[in-house]
From Swiss-Prot:
Principal cellular location given in the protein's record: secreted
Biological process terms in GO annotation: defense response to Gram-positive bacterium
Gene Ontology MF terms: lyase activity; nucleic acid binding; ribonuclease A activity; RNA nuclease activity
Family stated for the protein in its record: Belongs to the pancreatic ribonuclease family.
Catalytic function, reaction form: an [RNA] containing cytidine + H2O = an [RNA]-3'-cytidine-3'-phosphate + a 5'-hydroxy-ribonucleotide-3'-[RNA]; an [RNA] containing uridine + H2O = an [RNA]-3'-uridine-3'-phosphate + a 5'-hydroxy-ribonucleotide-3'-[RNA]
E.C. code: 4.6.1.18
Name assigned to this protein: Ribonuclease pancreatic
Organism: Macaca mulatta
Length: 152
């Protein structure tokens, strides 16, 4: 009798654990927003911007993320890039898109010699076209691939 109950309960327990694991996981679109969107501010020449933002956005937990870009445009404008010029991603995938116009961004690069837990970043405000990888339905950005200067 006890064996019968465990045969029923074990698959149920596995199912519950799988569902709970999925509920707590950040979607790729939400991760993109957390790591790359800063719509409420303009590019900052404040030298501590990247140090503050990288920490605030959980990119210095357990390691120092070497490079990151923040986009200072409305989310809808960045989402619309998914319907603009299709380009090949750096990794060879074909789901990347380049913005028609330049966008205000801030590049954050780990400074030489900086080591976890003391992550220190160089802040570089720029105006560039962005390239993002998009997925899903509706098509939304899930990866920041690159930024490029105006080709004109």
């Amino acid at each position: 009798m006890a064996l019968d109950k465990s045969v029923i309960l074990l698959p149920l327990l596995v199912l519950v654990l799988l569902v709970l694991g999925c509920l707590g996981r950040e979607s790729r679109a939400k991760k993109f927003q957390r790591q790359h969107m800063d719509s409420g501010s303009s590019p900052s020449s404040n030298s501590t911007y990247c140090n503050q933002m990288m920490k605030r956005r959980s990119m210095t937990h357990g390691r120092c993320k070497p490079v990151n870009t923040f986009v200072h445009e409305p989310l809808v404008d960045v989402q619309n890039v998914c319907f603009q010029e299709k380009v090949t991603c750096k990794n060879g995938q074909t789901n990347c898109f380049k913005s028609k116009s330049s966008m205000h961004i801030t590049d954050c690069r780990l400074t030489n010699g900086s080591r976890y837990p003391n992550c220190a970043y160089r802040t570089s405000p720029k105006e560039r076209h962005i390239i993002v990888a998009c997925e899903g339905s509706p098509h939304v950005p899930v990866h920041f691939d690159a930024s490029v200067e105006d080709s004109t």
